[in-house]
């Protein structure tokens, strides 16, 4: 899969990032997201595959494209019988976030990315549009920290695993009212807190790389992004755990349903009979071959954002493979055409 689709999915996230970056700083988060969705879908439909969106822009009735269940790729087109050889057909599941951090793009802030994860059919957890409690940590702490432990306990373990004092550790937490107690506990334990307004996928993945100065991600964020983070962290050998949040009182916002019981009923209808289950990276991204791809829209901890020049753009992308256990950074110059001749006076 890596050999056949690796470069293709890099181009998918590159095109989404370039489209969205044109709206950077214009205060139009919905437009920044919309153009990224359109660009991502257009490029996906040029790939020789039969892809199915398992995590996307929402339910079919709420999203015109890249909705959950939508099929993409050349082999889903009306004339697929003429274009595709069934013996060569690649069937994959896809999780997408064409503009991870729409507010970051709209206000010109760092850390937004176009991201996706793919696996063979059935290889990605089809997370509902709920919240998820998350814990990400470096490979050295894999299986040693635990989401059921307190932040204080996990920081002590992390300190030992990384051979660092607690006051050297940096924990990323989303700046939300629900995290006030968590933030206080982390600070009281002696660690430093980096607050982010949006975009916890990049924060989770940063834990998998040495030198990013991010040692853990803690707190509650969106579940679909948790699956994408898990796909990357699984390939990196890092620690990732997620637990679905089905009680609206925990987050006091409208991303999940109106009542706890309604959410439990929805989970049951999806075949999730243990709503309190803690999932690890292998359970969220269980496929034999899992690929993650991301491209910076605005510059962040991992990647430079899109930089435009006359007649083109420059992007920095990242592709991570569970099969080859590699992470490749890709620096690309996109040349739209020959530069115009400018006459100086």
UniProtKB/Swiss-Prot annotation:
Substrate binds at residues 100-102, 131, 176-178, 198-200. Its cofactor is Mn(2+). InterPro entries: FBPase_class-2/SBPase. CDD domains: FBPase_glpX (cd01516). It is an enzyme of class 3 (hydrolase). Belongs to the FBPase class 2 family. This is D-fructose 1,6-bisphosphatase class 2/sedoheptulose 1,7-bisphosphatase.
